[in-house]
């Protein structure tokens, strides 16, 4: 098992304030976390807000809450540059007596930022002092404080956010360029009849004099002025800028300052979400204030001392595609407190009502997210040991996060440690790990290949019809699962690369992430335009679609007797998105 060697480079989460200040600025453990009854989320979605006057746009049907997380640069150490006054990016309600409550837009004087993720601050509005989450603030009058500035998010993540069908045409964000140091990128949602809902990306270049431009004939002294101009004039863009891309409050880094080993009495178990061989998962509340997920382990499952030592390493693993470990109760029965994911385990999601609406683009996107989380685990020299759909959690907007990393090593159950016992996940385990206990990141890659079959078959058990002993024998003899029905050969070929006998010949997670993120631009032949999947929608109801509006009707219309090129849809149709009577997307 490896441990963290350096501070993760991956950004934390955040959002920005929109209104311009003046006229020139603009995881054998049950992973399911879906309760039987609706629970109030710990964070709420902040809707997009118009930038200037928005022209009337036809409404695309379907919709969803936006991603659980949006990344941004870490701001720790900002005081070293002499900045002590920060502005609040979100509302925050105190969770302990030492926390400081504040409202979005409040100005805060930072007293001490040397103690990690929670800074001591003094509100210039209320006059009170207390600890605040550092990823909820940004330096005053900085670009980081702008609501439209999303920092170091990837092109793919920006598209995931902007392809929300509830976003009107012209919804936008500004991010750092992935390819040019010091440059920025303006990402804008667009719509046309050929592509449906799509995203255009414009590089923002920097002048030697310090100004900015997209086209050299129109230059600006600041990014704020650039955004203000293009909110009034398209001037070569696909559309003028209308709404800032909406997002949600980020997770705080930990529950509060010094809230790591917490008393059992501070947790309230409210809704049982699942039960497995080694314990249960509950939705609950910490300190009467904060929604969390709580894993309760059966006594004797693992040594409390070994668990606490491993948890110290696990809590240092921070990435937007890993479920965050918040706190622990280290005396038996051990409690593990993590962030709450509203849609439960990926396995349950695939097999449930929502799974039947997933199409290949969404499945590949989910696989890319998992590969992204595991690429971070790979960079940190860590090993998961139990990667499968049951240990992936799903949140809003089809966000997927890896859970239960590292815990499998600590289990002290004979039916598990024998590696061929009834509780051991043999069908997901690489042969060198199952036979000889050689768990490495390359055995995780093998497991990822099996997870891909779970995705493409909507949760089918791997190696159907085979028992564990037979699977191990057949795999050792060279057997590999055939291509699942309706799975592209190129994706099956990727699975087979993950299942190479020599671990060193298996791809890295970095490669897997890049392959999957670029899958539809680099591996597949063009598909007819009317079959082209063009976006993501979160399933708010079973009948909601996972495709963009026009694409859904063009793709599914023929089976209901409707012509793909028809511009109107009438009547009640089973399986159609919730708004049935609509004009197909027209800008």
UniProtKB/Swiss-Prot annotation:
**What Pfam family does this protein match (any one)?**
PK_Tyr_Ser-Thr
Active-site residues (renumbered):
386 (proton acceptor)
Matching PROSITE patterns, A to Z?
A: PROTEIN_KINASE_ATP, PROTEIN_KINASE_DOM, PROTEIN_KINASE_TYR, SH2, SH3
What positions are modified (Phosphotyrosine)?
Answer: 416
According to its UniProt record, this protein's enzyme class is transferase
Where does the SH3 domain start and stop, copy by copy?
Answer: 81-142
Question: GO MF terms on file?
Answer: ATP binding; non-membrane spanning protein tyrosine kinase activity
Processing after translation:
The phosphorylated form is termed pp60v-src.
Q: Which residues form the Protein kinase domain?
A: 267-520
Task: Give the lipid-moiety residues, type N-myristoyl glycine.
Answer: 2
- Enzyme Commission number, as recorded: 2.7.10.2
Q: Which reaction does it catalyse?
A: L-tyrosyl-[protein] + ATP = O-phospho-L-tyrosyl-[protein] + ADP + H(+)
Keywords, comma-separated and alphabetical: ATP-binding, Kinase, Lipoprotein, Myristate, Nucleotide-binding, Oncogene, Phosphoprotein, SH2 domain, SH3 domain, Transferase, Tyrosine-protein kinase
Classification via InterPro entries: Kinase-like_dom_sf, Non-receptor_tyrosine_kinases, Prot_kinase_dom, Protein_kinase_ATP_BS, Ser-Thr/Tyr_kinase_cat_dom, SH2, SH2_dom_sf, SH3-like_dom_sf
SUPFAM superfamilies from the xrefs? Answer: Protein kinase-like (PK-like) (SSF56112), SH2 domain (SSF55550), SH3-domain (SSF50044)
Q: Which PANTHER family match?
A: TYROSINE-PROTEIN KINASE (PTHR24418)
| Family, as annotated | Belongs to the protein kinase superfamily. Tyr protein kinase family. SRC subfamily.
Q: Any idea what this protein is called?
A: Tyrosine-protein kinase transforming protein Src
* Species for this entry: Avian sarcoma virus (strain PR2257)
Which gene codes for it? V-SRC
């Amino acid at each position: 098992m490896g441990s963290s060697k350096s501070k993760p480079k991956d950004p934390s989460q955040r959002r920005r304030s929109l209104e311009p200040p003046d006229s020139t600025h603009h995881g054998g453990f049950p992973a399911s976390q879906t309760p039987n009854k609706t629970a109030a989320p710990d964070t709420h979605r902040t809707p997009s807000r118009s930038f200037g006057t928005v022209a009337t746009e036809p409404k695309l049907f379907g919709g969803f809450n936006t991603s659980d997380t949006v990344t941004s640069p870490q701001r720790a150490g900002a005081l070293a540059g002499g900045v002590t006054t920060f502005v609040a990016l979100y509302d925050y309600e105190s969770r302990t007596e030492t926390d400081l409550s504040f409202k979005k837009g409040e100005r805060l004087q930072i007293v001490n930022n040397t103690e990690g993720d929670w800074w001591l601050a003094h509100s210039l509005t209320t006059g009170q002092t207390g600890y605040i989450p550092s990823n909820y603030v940004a330096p005053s009058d900085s670009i980081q404080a702008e609501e439209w500035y999303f920092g170091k998010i990837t092109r793919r993540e920006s598209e995931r956010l902007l392809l929300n069908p509830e976003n009107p045409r012209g919804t936008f964000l500004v991010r750092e360029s992935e390819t040019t140091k010091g440059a920025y990128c303006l990402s804008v949602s667009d719509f046309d009849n050929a592509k449906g809902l799509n995203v255009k990306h414009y590089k923002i270049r920097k002048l030697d004099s310090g100004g900015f431009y997209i086209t050299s004939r129109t230059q600006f002294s600041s990014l704020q002025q650039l955004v203000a101009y293009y909110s009034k004039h398209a001037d070569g863009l696909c559309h003028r800028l209308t709404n800032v891309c909406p997002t949600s409050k980020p997770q705080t880094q930990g529950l509060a300052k010094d809230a790591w080993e917490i008393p059992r009495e501070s947790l309230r178990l409210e809704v049982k979400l699942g039960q497995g061989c080694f314990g249960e998962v509950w939705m609950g509340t910490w300190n009467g204030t904060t929604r969390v997920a709580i894993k309760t382990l059966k006594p004797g499952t693992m040594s409390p001392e070994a668990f606490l030592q491993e948890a110290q390493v696990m809590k240092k693993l921070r990435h937007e595609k890993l479920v965050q470990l918040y706190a622990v109760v280290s005396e038996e029965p051990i409690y593990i407190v993590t962030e709450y994911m509203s849609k439960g385990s990926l396995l349950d999601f695939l097999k449930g009502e929502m799974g039947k609406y997933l199409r290949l683009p969404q499945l590949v996107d989910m696989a890319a997210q998992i590969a992204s989380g595991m690429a971070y685990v790979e960079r940190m020299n860590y090993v998961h040991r139990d990667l499968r759909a049951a240990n992936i959690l799903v949140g809003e907007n089809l966000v997927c996060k890896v859970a239960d990393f590292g815990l499998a090593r600590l289990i002290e159950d004979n039916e598990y440690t024998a590696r061929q016992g009834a509780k051991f996940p043999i069908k997901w385990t690489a042969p060198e790990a199952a036979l000889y206990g050689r768990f490495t990141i390359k055995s995780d890659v093998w497991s990822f290949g099996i997870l891909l079959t779970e995705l493409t078959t909507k949760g089918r058990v791997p190696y159907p019809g085979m028992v564990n002993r037979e699977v191990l024998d057949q795999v050792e003899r060279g057997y590999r699962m055939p291509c699942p029905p309706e799975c592209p050969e190129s994706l099956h070929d990727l699975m087979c690369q993950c299942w190479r006998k020599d671990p060193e010949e298996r791809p890295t997670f970095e490669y897997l992430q890049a392959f999957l993120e670029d899958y539809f631009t680099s591996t597949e032949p063009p598909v007819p335009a009317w079959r082209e999947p063009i976006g993501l929608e979160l399933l708010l109801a079973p009948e909601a679609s996972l495709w963009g509006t026009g694409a859904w009707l063009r793709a599914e219309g023929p089976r209901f007797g409707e012509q793909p090129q028809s511009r109107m849809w009438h009547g009640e149709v089973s399986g159609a998105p919730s708004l049935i009577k609509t004009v197909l997307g027209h800008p």
